Amino acid sequence: LTLAIHYVLPGEEKLTVLQSLLSRLKILNFTFGVLYLDKAFAAGSILDYLTQSEQPAVIACPIRGKRGGTRALCQGRKSYRTDYTFTDGTPANLAMVATLVPNKSGKRRRKWLAYIVIHLPWKTQKIYGRYRRRFGIECSYRSMRQVRAHTTSRNPALRFFQLAVGLVLVNTWVFLRWEFARLIAPGPRWVDPRRFRFHRFTRLLIRAVEKLYGSVMSIQTQVLPESVIY
């Protein structure tokens, strides 16, 4: 579900964007345990704000530098946690996760991932596993692109509005599937995803629009059909 979006103006600080989204969640009375942020929010002002707010968070940290910087922490064979001070003087606790990923030839090579950890006692593997779940957000964006309206207009407000409508449609599908595709069984609620896939939802939307506005079944042409039909 997408609970809040923010129209980012040129030059707007990332901390302002984050505070706007968090205030919207507060209005909705939505509570959460841990905040997961991508690399764009790995800034000193955001770290200070979350630390002072005592908000548990995991933030992806870019690995920079050739030998120094956070790249100097990419040593050894095992994952670990360590304290680190950024160039702007902001202290942070980092989880350095060593992963093995295959290259083009199929050989597995070591790849380091860095996460800024705030008010969490978790081990590195738990941090890595929980943050990976965040990639489900990307799936909602891919679904949104299937139902958003497309335009050649360069008006950013119009584009933002169409994006918002697409996200509302995805939220609608999530709600309908949660209510009508659930399994009737004791215990916690489970959903059978095969009963109402997103593709079927989009087909139903198309049919509803065609029923409301009609559909085009022919085109004007100056060529007789008999001349091209054999």
Label the predicted regions:
Residues 1-30, 111:
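Electropositive, glycine- and tryptophan-enriched low-complexity nucleic-acid-binding patches
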Residues 23-28, 47-56:
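Short, surface-exposed basic-aromatic patches at helix termini and helix-loop junctions that form
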Residues 32-34:
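Short active-site oxyanion
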Residues 36-44, 63-65:
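Acidic, metal-coordinating catalytic cores used for nucleic-acid/nucleotide bond scission
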Residues 53-144:
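An anionic, glycine-rich sequence signature occurring as long contiguous blocks
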Residues 73-101, 146, 165-230:
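A short, flexible helix-boundary coil/loop motif
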Residues 122-131, 143-163, 180-184:
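Short, solvent-exposed helix-loop connector elements
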